[in-house]
Amino acid sequence: MLPIAIGICMKYNKMNYFKHETAIVDEPCTIGEGTKIWHFSHIMSNCTIGEKCNIGQNVVISPEVVLGNNVKVQNNVSIYTGVTCDDDVFLGPSMVFTNVINPRSAINRRDQYAKTHVGKGASIGANATIVCGHDIGEYAFIGAGAVVTKTIPDFALVVGNPAKQLGWVGEYGHRLEFNADGIAVCPESHQEYKLENNKVIKIKD
């Protein structure tokens, strides 16, 4: 679930989050308790950032972006208007979002920003590119350097340019090996999953 308002950052002397002295936080915005914002990052106005997020160095978060709780944003990431991330999302170093399908310097297309939604628990690897207008499913895993040009289903593992699906992963990020009955077990959590009609679902908590 996306966060509700948890701490307006208009009164810096009452912040319930950490902001490095070189970081810039524009007003108004909402930043959750326990979030950390590191060197040279810029949080623009009207953003919503949940609790216990970690915003790395040299990160830009554009107006009206929404991040859930416990989102990890690594160094050198720009998150543009139109992007929303649910809880527990991981954005790897220097990964890229876009928000206009056909940008031109001489043509203002600010009213044509395409939306991108990243589902709960998904991971996007270093230097990956997410072309706007395509959603990333829950717990999906986008490999380093991948270029995503279509919507990615829950639990999918994708790599390459353009990104192609190699298989499936569980909530802990391990690749799932399905037996003849379509059942797989995570080697770490022992969670069971079922593959049916090209969709993966949890079948046992």
Predicted region positions:
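Short cysteine-rich clusters marking metal-coordination/redox-active sites
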Residues: 170, 186-189
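Cys/His-enriched microdomains
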Residues: 165-168, 184
